[in-house]
Regions:
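Non-catalytic accessory regions flanking glycosidase/transglycosidase catalytic cores in CAZymes
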Residues: 2, 6-177, 182-184, 188-234, ...
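A short alpha-helix capping/helix-coil boundary motif
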Residues: 110-113, 263-266, 302-306
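Short, contiguous strand/loop micro-motifs
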Residues: 119-120, 195-196, 272-273, 311-313
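Substrate-binding/catalytic cleft of secreted carbohydrate-active enzymes
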Residues: 185-196, 254-279
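Catalytic-core regions of glycoside hydrolase
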Residues: 236-250, 254-256, 274-291
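Long, acidic, intrinsically disordered low-complexity segments
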Residues: 270-285, 324-327, 332
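Hydrophobic alpha-helical scaffolding
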Residues: 271-275, 312-319, 379-386
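Active-site clefts of carbohydrate-active enzymes
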Residues: 289-317
Length: 510
């Protein structure tokens, strides 16, 4: 298992199918909805986005005046969660006044060409936090704010947290302290010396949390925000929760399905096949969170680490991956997910100014704008727009606030199936990840329905970077989206649905 697969929850779950490949012949399938088998309620703020904290070094980005970005956030979710963190958060500093001195830039030992961390500092001024407050008010979203742990001090973190809490108030969900600390001792990171480990992390983390709490008694925290170590997440809950009590509200970790982009083994076929071996880790984390009355949130991830792979992360394949992955996490009890993205300048800075996806792009380098995996294209000087992965998130958003229902069977090759009920309407998502082989689905239920409609998630091909639609409608740069329903005949309480290869449907039953 590589460092990005510990939360590889694209595996089968009780209400989802386990991908066994992406090439499957047409095989009729019967699915029964078990409405008496109710699961968890999907939180209304399940959907989220993750950005580099250094994006705040340009205060106009997250502001109420960034109209197209506000519109696309609101379209994606009326109550989503923005997470600010990433590698750049370890090199950001709060410039409270013009006289506030910058911290010393940490330079790790060894060859900087092999180091994947930023090599410069990013100043965050009060004006950026003020603008961020307006952005959150305009979108209806709340925030997870990442504090610099790798190259800062408890006193600096406390001063920054005090201003953030004062300005954001109830819009602030919790603070995270540090980003991917399980990688600190590696040469690619270099934030801590070799041999530094979990016990060192907890001791230092608690010093930061106590300093923040002394300045901000109402502060709440989440962690450990690891890259790959599920055991760190569980140990963090077990060891830190008793010390912090109600101040700790969430366990968090990251997940990237594939990577790096210049590895020839990273393919669309492998992305959509999923990784069933890691579902057990996800369930273990949820159990640990439940034991301490915490939530578990996947706070940073996407289809392929180190910026994404062209022709996969920026293509329709990512739409299907996102829809299936988000619904799988929901079915396993995850309280939310934040897919990473943003301006290519800050994504590249967060990788030590490396961008391996460009090697794959070759002469097609303009397609790298914003990073290949970003849900929303926001390159400087350009109008924002919804990328393919955004549409998969849009499908999953329909389940926000719904109560999950059991489905039988639990497995069906490359077809992912998810059911839920919201306000008397049953939702059924079917994601056909096969590259060829349409599926004919016979739907039955233990309750009667008289009306059925559906929206289809479609694209010209798995590698298509344009032409993606959900409900026969694209999302405009102004956030306009007008889905059109397709009626389905209901006969004796059952219905037939055709799900073409490389597509998904969302069915509404009432």
């Amino acid at each position: 298992m590589n460092r990005r697969t510990f939360l590889g929850i694209t595996a089968c779950a009780t209400t989802a199918a386990c991908a066994q490949g992406v090439r499957e012949q047409n095989a009729p399938l019967s699915i029964r909805i078990r409405s008496e088998h109710q699961g968890r309620r999907v939180p209304r703020n399940f959907i989220g986005l993750s950005y580099e904290l250094a994006q705040l070094s340009e205060p106009a980005f997250f502001s109420a005046q960034h109209n197209d970005l506000v519109a696309l956030f609101r379209r994606l979710s009326p109550s989503g969660v923005l997470r600010l963190g990433g590698n750049t958060s370890e090199f950001c500093w709060f410039q409270a006044t013009p006289e506030t001195p910058a911290p010393k830039l940490h330079t790790p030992p060894g060859d900087l060409g092999q180091n994947w961390m930023p090599h410069r500092l990013f100043a965050i001024q009060p004006a950026a936090i003020d603008a961020l407050a307006g952005f959150l008010d305009a979108t209806g979203w709340t925030l997870i704010y990442g504090l610099n742990f790798g190259n800062s001090t408890p006193a600096r973190a406390a001063a920054e947290a005090a201003y953030v809490q004062q300005k954001l108030g109830s819009r602030l969900n919790f603070f995270q302290i540090g980003n991917e600390p399980d990688l600190y001792q590696k040469a690619s990171n270099g934030t801590r010396p070799p041999g530094w480990g979990f016990d060192d992390y907890v001791r230092e983390w608690l010093a930061f949390a106590d300093a923040v709490s002394a300045r901000v008694p109402e502060a709440r925290f989440g962690g450990p925000d690891t890259a790959a170590s599920s055991d760190w997440v569980i140990r963090f809950g077990n060891e830190v929760a008793p010390k912090l009590g109600k101040r700790l509200v969430a366990l968090s970790g990251h997940y990237y399905a594939e990577g790096p982009p210049n590895d020839p083994r990273v393919t669309t076929e492998r992305l959509l096949a999923g990784n069933p071996a890691v579902a057990e880790s996800a369930r273990a984390i949820v159990r640990a969170a439940d034991a301490h009355n915490l939530i578990y949130r996947m706070t940073e991830g996407n289809s392929c680490y180190r910026g994404g792979k062209p022709g996969m992360s920026d293509a329709f394949a990512a739409s299907l991956w996102a829809a299936d992955y988000l619904m799988t996490l929901a079915s396993l009890g995850c309280a939310g997910i934040n897919l990473h993205g943003g301006d290519s300048r800050f994504l590249s800075a967060g990788l030590g100014d490396h961008n391996p996806g460009l090697e794959v792009a070759g002469n097609n380098k303009p397609s790298a704008a914003n990073g290949f995996y970003t849900p929303i294209a926001t390159e400087r000087g350009q109008v924002a727009g919804a990328r393919p992965v955004y549409y998969g998130m849009l499908l999953a958003q329909e389940f926000a606030g719904a109560t999950l229902l059991g489905l039988e069977p639990a497995q069906s090759g490359s077809l992912g199936a998810y059911g839920a009920e919201r306000s008397g309407t049953v939702l059924l998502a079917l994601v056909n990840k096969a590259s060829f082989g349409d599926r004919d689905i016979h739907i039955m239920s233990d309750r009667s329905f008289s009306r059925a409609t559906l929206w289809r998630l479609t694209g010209p091909g798995l590698d298509a970077t344009t032409g993606v639609e959900f409900g026969r409608s694209a999302v405009s740069s102004e956030g306009a989206w007008n889905p059109r329903s397709e009626p389905l005949p209901v006969r004796n309480g059952a219905l037939q649905i055709a799900v073409p290869a490389a597509s998904a449907v969302l069915v509404f039953l009432s």
